Regions:
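Hydrophobic core of transmembrane alpha-helices in multi-pass small-molecule transporters
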Residues: 39, 107, 115-138, 146, ...
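Helix-loop boundary and gating motifs at the non-cytosolic
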Residues: 16-79, 279-287, 291-322
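Juxtamembrane intracellular "pre-TM" segments in multi-pass secondary transporters
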Residues: 3-28, 225-291, 308, 474
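Structural signature of the two symmetry-related core transmembrane helices
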Residues: 95-110, 346-361
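Glycine-rich segments within core transmembrane alpha-helices of 12-TM secondary carriers
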Residues: 157-183, 412-420
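Symmetry-related core transmembrane helices of the 12-TM Major Facilitator Superfamily/SLC fold
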Residues: 195-216, 435-453
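Helix-to-loop junctions at the C-terminal end of transmembrane segments
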Residues: 79-93, 182, 331-344, 428-429
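Residue-level signature of mid-helix packing/kink "hotspots" within the transmembrane helices
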Residues: 74-82, 171-172, 325-333, 414-418
Length: 500
């Protein structure tokens, strides 16, 4: 019996460490608050994603205006996120999170009361409303910088993985609750759909307030300039020789270089070498095609399409997208093992291509069941290419250029994605909503095939000195790639895990 208890204890200890829970626990209260903050926020984002297009339709907005709203909101979130991220370290990260949470609550309050298109658009662009369910505002980049700042290299990947996984589960909960909430509210006396949709934004007010509270109680350790350098400087000034000051200055510069301050936008492109550009031009072209397709068939628009075509109950609609979100979360766990066995490009193509085909055929079924199966295939496999893509970019780009390349990649993808909803809105208004899925599926398939033909034979790690020889066909990845795979798990979404 004692032996069995000892064996169970060892297994529990192994699971505790291997699951990353030990890393999250050791990271401390600030990390817990950051993880909880994003989980609550994604709960609200996904709850609104499920209903916002239907809400606008009930208000009498044209389909074109619905698409235009989503495009402008996405652009507004990106601009706000870029500006605030560049200023965050100077203003104070916690202050920025407090301001973001406040704007989120204010936006929720406006949406819960007003029905004018331009007032709602202003609230969505200036405030923090995610029409696509994506975390494109100022929060995520700052929170990831804070998590990286308060964790060690040994625990960082596990903490970031739980940060993403927890938020995905929160998003699934938001989708499930939103459908039930709307349906239950409409059964109450004096409540109609418009009033119920207004009420869903109460969750925005609540989660915004919680984000403010969490940011208030975080410690000064999360700030970019928090270290013990001032105390050390006092001690040195009292007793150490002047020549040691140069060493202190070098150490201070190294610490500053390790913080997550974003590079200046003007210097990003010029810092990328011509060799890297020759590779990235092709990849950027393909990623732009893929992002345009994603924008045309975003989750909000897909929900709107299902609601108009089949008119399922709001609870059913919520359960469908909640289950799809859980599938997407679970599938990302297998991205790393698949990449080690198939290679990065093969994993990206062989998982994303079935998802693209399901988008192409999505408008064809006349029954809800087959349509939902296609949706599950699409969302279940959709996110598995994100982590391998990040690892592939890291493998073909010089280490000192990765930050610039990642920044340019994110900007191009977002701009392309923002164009999509307006195109779909125009098609939907003319009674050709289904064409958006046809075009989106074709564009995604073009991306997949182009990716395979252009890059499957490319040698990886040619810029890294610790590899004795380059690796062809992406058939193996090293420990650095594995860590990046783990850190990249919704995304993109993420920033893509949620938006497709």
């Amino acid at each position: 019996m004692a032996t069995q208890r000892s064996s169970l204890g060892q297994k529990a200890g192994w699971l505790y460490h291997e699951s990353g829970i030990s890393a999250v626990y050791s990271a401390g209260r600030d990390a817990w608050l950051l993880i909880l903050s994003r989980t609550c926020r994604m709960f609200a984002f996904k709850a609104v994603t499920l209903t916002i297009a239907q809400f606008f339709s009930e208000l009498g907005f044209s389909d074109f205006r619905i698409g235009l709203f989503m495009s402008l909101t996405l652009l507004g979130d990106v601009v706000l996120g870029l500006v605030v991220t560049l200023m965050a370290d100077g203003l104070g990260r916690r202050r920025v999170l407090v301001a973001g949470g406040f704007l989120m609550a204010v936006s929720g309050a406006i949406f819960s009361v007003f029905e004018n298109f331009w007032i709602l658009l202003f609230a969505a662009v200036v405030g923090v409303v995610s029409a696509s369910g994506s975390d494109f505002g100022p929060f995520r980049a700052i929170e990831e910088s804070m998590l990286s700042h308060i964790t060690t290299p040994k625990t960082r990947a596990d903490v970031l993985a739980w940060y993403i996984t927890s938020s995905s589960l929160g998003a699934a909960g938001g989708a499930a609750l939103a459908g039930r909430f709307v349906e239950n509210m409409t059964k109450r006396e004096g409540w109609n759909l418009v009033r119920a949709y207004h009420a869903t934004f109460w969750v925005y007010i609540l989660m915004g307030a919680l984000n403010v509270l969490f940011a208030f109680v975080m410690s000064n350790k999360t700030e970019a300039h928090h270290d013990d350098s001032s105390e050390a400087s006092d001690e040195l000034a009292e007793g150490l020789l002047r020549e040691s000051m140069e060493e202190e200055e070098d150490a201070r510069r190294r610490r500053q270089s390790m913080t997550s301050n974003p590079p200046e936008p003007a210097s990003r492109f010029s810092s990328v070498s011509s060799g890297t550009r020759s590779v990235m031009y092709r990849l950027w072209f393909l990623l732009t095609i893929d992002s345009l397709a994603d924008g045309m068939v975003s989750e909000s628009l897909t929900t709107y399409f299902l609601d108009h075509k089949f008119s399922p109950s709001k609870t059913t609609l919520g359960n469908i997208f909640s289950s799809a979100q859980v599938l997407a979360t679970v599938s990302t766990v297998f991205a790393g093992p698949l990449s080690r066995h198939l290679g990065l490009i093969n994993t990206m193509v062989f998982t994303h291509l079935p998802s693209s085909i399901s988008v192409l055929f999505f408008p064809l079924p006349s029954g809800l069941v087959l349509t939902v199966i296609l949706l599950f295939i699409r969302m279940g496999l959709n996110n598995m290419d994100q982590a391998p893509r990040a690892a592939f970019i890291a493998a073909v780009v010089k280490p000192e250029e990765r930050t610039a390349v990642m920044g340019i990649t994110s900007t191009l993808r977002t701009l392309a994605m923002a164009t999509g909803p307006s195109l779909t809105g125009g098609l939907a208004e003319s009674g050709r909503f289904w064409i958006a899925f046809l075009v989106g599926g074709i564009l995604r398939i073009m991306y997949d095939l182009g990716l395979w033909f252009m890059f499957v034979n490319m040698r990886l790690h040619s810029h890294e000195t610790h590899h004795e020889e380059s690796v062809p066909r992406g058939q193996s990845i090293d420990e650095e790639d594995v860590e990046m795979l783990r850190q990249s798990i919704e995304s993109e979404s993420s920033d893509e895990e949620h938006r497709k």
